[in-house]
């Protein structure tokens, strides 16, 4: 199933926007902002197809990490369509930036930087860059949109709303020409369960031809987590922590504070101070990770299946075949199986 399929039944204000883009100096950048189910992806699909038909080279930056059209979820992706497309899910990404979650409220830095990186690449190869964004537009979400606009400075920011985003419109005005579009009467609403099913289908499609691969923590950087950072704890230190807190300590490191991977042994384990970060071993299972190259871009994502802490080796399920460019394994904050079942989100400070 495809979300936001292209339709020729287009409101007049979209036609006027298309005409404005076609007449602008190139390269041109458009950022589309709007709430959930406001028609952002449909607008980008319409504009992309029409601009292609006019002979322009088009780039699409998909930063809707929770409802990605361009695989994989949990990343910001750049696609360069070569011909007509009915939905963004038909597009193949040529570059990605790892965010590592489908709920980016704690990752506004990664979201803003990721869009900036993709737009920088796109402006070098395309006449028109179209940026799709999440439907997260209040509170932290509004700040995220402002940061993206401030970094990218789009030529036009199209805000799709029915009056509820007037405050955000004012906040975006210093960073680009803002135009307001009405929410189309034909826009489709997607219930939460249907959104989950759509995302599960995308996870399954992405991981369909995956294989289990292994990385050494001594050969690649481990980021997005406190694991493997610091001096490993010795047996006496592990035993002391186990007795003090009722844990089975799987691994641990000391830096300014302590980081331990543990499993609870006692039914009611004791509390600990902030200087001690305790990571539940089970929360590492099926964790989404990014395979990062030497330029900080994401070559693809994988599912963490096992860590051999004594040998410092990580087993990851991924469809990425050529691993020679991987320089970093970056931990995300969503647990998901290769069958598409989402096992839960983690807070940023949990790892």
UniProtKB/Swiss-Prot annotation:
GO MF annotation, one: ATP-dependent polyribonucleotide 5'-hydroxyl-kinase activity
Annotated InterPro entries: Clp1/Grc3, CLP1_P, P-loop_NTPase
Annotated ATP binding sites: 34-41
Keyword Nucleus: no
Taxonomic superkingdom: Archaea
Enzyme class per UniProt: transferase
UniProt keyword annotations, A-Z: ATP-binding, Kinase, Nucleotide-binding, Transferase
Cofactor: a divalent metal cation
Functional summary from the UniProt entry: Polynucleotide kinase that can phosphorylate the 5'-hydroxyl groups of both single-stranded RNA (ssRNA) and single-stranded DNA (ssDNA). Exhibits a strong preference for ssRNA.
Name of the protein in its database record: Polyribonucleotide 5'-hydroxyl-kinase TK1956
């Amino acid at each position: 199933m495809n979300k936001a399929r292209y339709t020729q039944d287009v409101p007049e204000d979209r036609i006027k926007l298309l005409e404005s883009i076609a007449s602008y100096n190139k390269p041109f950048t458009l950022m589309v902002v709007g709430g959930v189910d406001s028609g952002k992806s449909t607008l980008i699909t319409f504009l992309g197809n029409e601009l292609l038909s006019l002979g322009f080279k088009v780039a699409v930056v998909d930063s809707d990490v929770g409802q990605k059209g361009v695989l994989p979820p949990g990343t910001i992706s750049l696609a360069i369509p070569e011909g007509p497309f009915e939905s963004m899910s038909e597009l193949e990404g040529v570059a990605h930036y790892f965010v590592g979650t489908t709920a980016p409220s704690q990752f506004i830095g990664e979201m803003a930087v990721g869009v900036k990186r993709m737009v920088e690449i796109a402006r070098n190869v395309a006449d028109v860059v179209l940026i799709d964004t999440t439907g997260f537009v209040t509170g932290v979400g509004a700040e995220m949109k402002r940061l993206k606009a401030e970094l990218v400075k789009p030529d036009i920011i199209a805000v799709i709303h029915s009056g509820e985003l007037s405050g955000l419109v004012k906040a975006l005005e210093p960073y680009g020409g803002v135009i307001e579009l009405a929410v189309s009467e034909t826009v489709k609403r997607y219930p939460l369960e249907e959104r989950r099913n759509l995302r599960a289908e995308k996870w399954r499609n992405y991981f369909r031809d995956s294989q289990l691969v292994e990385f050494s923590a001594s050969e690649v950087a481990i980021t997005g987590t406190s694991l493997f950072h610091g001096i490993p704890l010795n047996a006496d230190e592990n035993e002391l922590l186990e007795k003090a807190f009722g844990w089975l300590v799987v691994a641990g490191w000391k830096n300014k504070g302590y980081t331990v991977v543990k499993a609870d042994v006692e039914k009611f384990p004791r509390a600990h101070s902030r200087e001690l970060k305790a990571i539940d071993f089970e929360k590492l299972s099926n964790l989404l990770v990014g395979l990062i190259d030497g330029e900080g871009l994401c070559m693809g994502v994988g599912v963490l299946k096992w860590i051999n802490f004594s040998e410092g080796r990580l087993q990851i399920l991924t469809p990425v075949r050529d691993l020679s460019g991987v320089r970093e394994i970056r931990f995300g904050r969503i647990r998901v199986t290769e069958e598409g079942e989402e096992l839960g989100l983690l807070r940023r400070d949990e790892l």
